[in-house]
């Protein structure tokens, strides 16, 4: 703010995507074994962090005559539950099977609630708040995982890392000046089913 005189956009994109350690007799990604300290840390980073940034910078944006935009980066897993079948491996006992940890979806769903709250809170100051809900990005996952997840996406593939930029730039820009409180999935159609 000191360098530019004002702030007119905020992107809340901090999150943990927990990779939880296993032991010989437990898989800590599983709900019944999930450590409370990891729960607290993931909520603090992903949800409390977005709240604090929105609280501080949203007030600054609200002081601008033209307002501005807050975009919370949620996920398709904030709209739908993770398909835990994607993480299963043959020959591994149930209690040791990997799953998508609970906190990722909880944080991403919480961001949708925060988005809706903020969309109404500062609307009279022309501060818009929307959520971008990207699907998964292909980034070196095992071939069997990519094959299975692609079957669940109408476009038949995961996203490339640069395929969310256009939607994010649009949501931050004046081209979306009447978009407020929107939850925008960019997921190849995965949540359309």
Residue ranges and their predicted role:
Residues 28, 89-92, 151, 169, ...:
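Short C-terminal tail/terminal secondary-structure segment
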Residues 8, 16, 27-51, 71, ...:
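Catalytic Tyr-X3-Lys loop
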Residues 15, 36, 41-65, 77-81, ...:
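Amphipathic alpha-helical dimer-interface segment in Rossmann-like NAD(P)H-dependent oxidoreductases
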Residues 30-36, 71-124:
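Catalytic loop of short-chain dehydrogenase/reductase
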Residues 153-164, 175:
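A conserved structural motif in NAD(P)-dependent oxidoreductases
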Residues 1-5:
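Conserved amphipathic alpha-helix within the SDR
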Residues 13-27, 189:
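Conserved NAD(P)H cofactor-binding loop of Rossmann-fold oxidoreductase domains
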Residues 123-128, 179-181:
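Short, small/polar-rich loop/turn modules that mediate ligand/substrate recognition or access, typified
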């Amino acid at each position: 703010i000191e360098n530019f005189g004002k702030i007119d956009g905020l992107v809340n994109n901090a999150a943990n995507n927990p990779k939880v350690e296993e032991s010989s007799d437990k898989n800590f990604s599983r709900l019944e074994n999930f450590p409370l300290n990891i729960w607290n840390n993931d909520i603090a980073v992903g949800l409390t962090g977005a709240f604090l940034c929105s609280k501080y910078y949203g007030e600054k944006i609200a002081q601008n005559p033209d307002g501005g935009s807050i975009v919370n980066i949620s996920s398709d897993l904030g709209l739908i539950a993770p398909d835990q079948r994607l993480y299963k491996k043959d020959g591994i006992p149930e209690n040791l099977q990997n799953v998508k940890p609970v906190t990722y979806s909880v944080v991403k769903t919480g961001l949708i609630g925060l988005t809706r709250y903020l969309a109404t809170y500062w609307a009279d100051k022309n501060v818009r708040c929307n959520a971008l809900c990207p699907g998964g990005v292909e980034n070196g996952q095992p071939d069997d995982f990519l094959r299975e997840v692609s079957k669940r996406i109408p476009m038949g593939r995961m996203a490339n890392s640069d395929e969310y930029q256009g939607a994010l730039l649009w949501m931050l820009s004046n081209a979306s000046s009447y978009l407020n409180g929107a939850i925008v999935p960019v997921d190849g159609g995965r949540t359309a089913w």
